[in-house]
From Swiss-Prot, chains A, B:
GO molecular function, one term: magnesium ion binding
Name the record gives this protein: Phosphoribosyl-AMP cyclohydrolase
EC number: 3.5.4.19
The protein's assembly and partners: Homodimer.
UniProt function note: Catalyzes the hydrolysis of the adenine ring of phosphoribosyl-AMP.
Family annotation (SUPFAM superfamilies): HisI-like
Record-level GO BP terms: L-histidine biosynthetic process
Gene: hisI
Enzyme class: hydrolase
Amino acid sequence: MTLTFPAPSKDKAELETGPAFTPRFDEKGLVTAVVTDARDGELLMVAHMNAEALALTIETGIAHYYSRSRNSLWKKGESSGNTQAVQEIRTDCDQDAIWLKVTVAGHDATCHTGRRSCFYRTVGVENGKARVTITDEHRHFDPAQIYAEKKG
Amino acid sequence: MTLTFPAPSKDKAELETGPAFTPRFDEKGLVTAVVTDARDGELLMVAHMNAEALALTIETGIAHYYSRSRNSLWKKGESSGNTQAVQEIRTDCDQDAIWLKVTVAGHDATCHTGRRSCFYRTVGVENGKARVTITDEHRHFDPAQIYAEKKG
């Protein structure tokens, strides 16, 4: 990893309009990453990146994240083959969020459940209770098979 | 606020496929909210919601967030008029992120800089340094005027 990120400016104008990319990592050293499909803009997933994951993503063109559950660097798709080739990287006004437009390899599935997107459910209210409804049941791969194979 | 959210199940299958909406608020009581334009899917902003903001959003159909900088409930667009009418709410596999598809009122601008989207810059590398490039200079409103008016 050779790419490093300078500390964010305290000057709001510099942060919003200056030429330097100075991501505002939170107290855990993470920024939020929003991932959409470069093909049609569909939201695929939301994840987090530390400086190492962000630098690797920029340098290799393949999306890397930081897994908060495993506390480790996470090359997305390493097990399932559904790696993400980054077509464009954007950041927001206060530089604490990253937007990746990606092309998904493998089964064209981003969710570990085998679905194309992690956002396969709508939220609504039913009899005064908040409920979710699955709108995408199509599995691009069988998680039990794919993740078992890679473990072996 | 009448809508409440039960604690998330510890059973992964229940969380991923059960009918209950049980958002996984983090240790600060927040979930990440990704906001896209219902018209064309453009990513407009990333923000955070506490239970109150999420319940108000579901109940009123107008997007509410929790401002981490002001530590308070934030009805988006209250000052600028650029409120967000929610067309659809989605959640992801582990229910720690929310996706709002919205129609923006007012100037059709979501960013406080007056731009349509907060993601008005691409990220790249120039001479070994990470740089940002502004790709959208169009301001839908003049922030100095709009926010000054509302303060007065």
